[in-house]
Amino acid sequence: MNFNKLFLIVILAALLLLGQTEAGRLKKLGKKIEKAGKRVFNAVQKGLPVAAGVQALGR
């Protein structure tokens, strides 16, 4: 009998934790990560020709 109550509580907790959540927080975090990735990508694009030129001078 106690097992049934415990099983029911575990199932309810799993449904609450794994159910649909508000995407607002996750969406904001994803946008911040995407923005940081774009900044890094743009910085690499700007810096790569400079680094290639320095390497060519060293040879």
Swiss-Prot record:
Which keywords fit this entry according to its UniProt record?
Answer: Amidation, Antibiotic, Antimicrobial, Immunity, Innate immunity, Secreted, Signal
Please give the Pfam families that the UniProt record associates with this protein.
Cecropin
Q: Which residues carry this modification: Leucine amide?
A: 57
User: Which cellular compartments is it found in?
Assistant: Secreted
Q: Where does the UniProt annotation place the signal sequence? A: 1-23
Family to which this protein belongs: Belongs to the cecropin family.
- What name appears for this protein in its UniProt entry? Cecropin-B1
- Could you tell me which species this protein originates from? Culex pipiens pipiens
Q: What is the lineage of its organism?
A: Eukaryota, Metazoa, Ecdysozoa, Arthropoda, Hexapoda
